């Protein structure tokens, strides 16, 4: 039995924790909302994030980070991007005292504005300087609501260290979620992060009343943008974006009502403001954060990402959705295949 500390007990953290307990692991969920921790421990439910669902009874929750990390061989980060660095600093302090060197796994999908760093890079900075090998990223078509019901899916687990990727593959795989190893850590992370921006755009199209052709075209051109950023800035492998963490995650996030980013975009397409949407969503919309980092990269490195840039302008510069759509369709002719 492996002890796994799951940092973040929102919907995805709770579902992953329950799944890992299904696999026979000793799972402790860490979160900072006392009422959520109390409910998980008392009834193994998490009604704040997941209605009408129960966690595996061999899970427990705590608000004490040191308790969660004590004896953990694997630490799974399932936090909002904006919280990763501060929690990682606290993790480093505790690990330095204990001397423990657990494997770090990130299920967070985002890019940090300002630093423009991926989650694995933040964890390397704060916990394992110059030791990226001890970090694994998991990403793929996997909404918490579906995995909670043990619907079937497949997810990539990526690391620069093949043995660590295989360890995660063995620990996480079961009869309803299949994990595939991948050696392109940054590529897997870029796909998982930037598809949230494209999903906001897909939701906007639906909110504006556009049909399937428009959505398919958007997703395809969005994938081109994700690939361009991943290859040209982060040094990712182009083929990664044809996999589970690329097109797989993009499809489900751009088409499912379970996607927060898609739902946020739909409301914006219907005329609601970003502030209104974020206030009423009740959960994190990662694409709204990631698009800031993408915008910074586009400006600094002259990367051509017109869909992502249009979403940034709609969300943060107050431009009109209809105007941005007209601008997009009126751009100068370009070849389809280019990096």
Curated annotation (Swiss-Prot):
A GO cellular-component term linked to this record: cytosol
Alphabetized GO MF terms: glycerol-3-phosphate dehydrogenase [NAD(P)+] activity; NAD binding
SUPFAM superfamilies registered for this protein in UniProt: 6-phosphogluconate dehydrogenase C-terminal domain-like, NAD(P)-binding Rossmann-fold domains
Enzyme class: oxidoreductase
EC number: 1.1.1.94
Pfam families linked: NAD_Gly3P_dh_C, NAD_Gly3P_dh_N
Reactions catalysed: sn-glycerol 3-phosphate + NAD(+) = dihydroxyacetone phosphate + NADH + H(+); sn-glycerol 3-phosphate + NADP(+) = dihydroxyacetone phosphate + NADPH + H(+)
Keyword Nucleotide-binding found: yes
Subcellular localization, as worded in the UniProt entry: Cytoplasm
The keyword Iron-sulfur is assigned to this record: no
InterPro entries in UniProt: 6-PGluconate_DH-like_C_sf, 6PGD_dom2, G3P_DH_NAD-dep, G3P_DH_NAD-dep_C, G3P_DH_NAD-dep_N, NAD(P)-bd_dom_sf
UniProt keyword terms in alphabetical order: Cytoplasm, Lipid biosynthesis, Lipid metabolism, NAD, NADP, Nucleotide-binding, Oxidoreductase, Phospholipid biosynthesis, Phospholipid metabolism
Binding site for NADPH: 11-12, 109, 144, 260, 284, 286
Residues forming the catalytic site: 195 (proton acceptor)
Known function: Catalyzes the reduction of the glycolytic intermediate dihydroxyacetone phosphate (DHAP) to sn-glycerol 3-phosphate (G3P), the key precursor for phospholipid synthesis.
NCBIfam families: PRK00094.1-2 (NF000940), PRK00094.1-3 (NF000941), PRK00094.1-4 (NF000942)
Name of the protein in its database record: Glycerol-3-phosphate dehydrogenase [NAD(P)+]
Native organism: Lactobacillus acidophilus (strain ATCC 700396 / NCK56 / N2 / NCFM)
Upper lineage: Bacteria, Bacillati, Bacillota, Bacilli, Lactobacillales
